[in-house]
């Protein structure tokens, strides 16, 4: 949040206690927060040659994912396009009534929904734990 202090402060003023900025956490605590979340937020990448592995962890939860894309070449976009509980919002579109209406509609549509892991695994078979382990073993 250090790079986004002003935006985070504005969001906190609007959302009050609904916005949590815990700072750095041990993995167990971060995992517990993720498990309690209704929607997971993915921050877009401006570099088209870097894929955040966290996204696949998010897919594995089966939870809705809100992705905030910074550019059209974000490498996560093809994967998010396959995920039925994803919404991608683009920075270039700004915060307009249309964008906020779209977000509001989506939040109501996905409320309480979660994909079973088996369904997510069918969407991304090459990224299941078994397939990744097979690939590691192939190279050892």
Predicted features and spans:
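Short loop/turn segments at beta->alpha junctions
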Residues: 25-26, 72, 128
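Short hydrophobic beta-strand element within catalytic cores of glycosyltransferases
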Residues: 39-41, 57, 64-70
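Acidic donor-binding loop of glycosyltransferase active sites
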Residues: 34-49
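A charged, aromatic-enriched C-terminal amphipathic alpha-helix characteristic of glycosyltransferases
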Residues: 91-101, 105-140
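Short alpha-helical segment that forms part of, or immediately flanks, the ligand-binding pocket
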Residues: 31, 53-63, 77-78
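Short acidic alpha-helix that forms the nucleotide-activated donor recognition element
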Residues: 26-37, 60
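Nucleotide-activated donor-binding/catalytic signature segment of Leloir-type glycosyltransferases, i.e.
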Residues: 1-29
């Amino acid at each position: 949040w250090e790079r986004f202090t002003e935006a985070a402060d504005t969001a906190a003023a609007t959302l009050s206690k609904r916005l949590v900025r815990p700072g750095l956490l041990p993995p167990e605590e971060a995992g517990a927060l993720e498990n309690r979340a209704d929607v997971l937020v993915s921050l877009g990448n401006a570099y088209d040659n870097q894929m955040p592995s966290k996204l696949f962890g998010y897919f594995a939860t089966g939870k809705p994912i809100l992705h905030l894309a910074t550019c059209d070449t974000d490498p996560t976009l093809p994967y998010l396009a396959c995920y039925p509980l994803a919404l991608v919002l683009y920075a270039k579109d700004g915060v307009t009534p249309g964008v906020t209406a779209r977000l509001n509609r989506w939040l109501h549509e996905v409320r309480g929904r979660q994909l079973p892991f088996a369904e997510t695994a069918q969407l991304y078979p090459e990224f299941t734990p078994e397939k990744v382990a097979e690939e590691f073993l192939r190279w050892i």
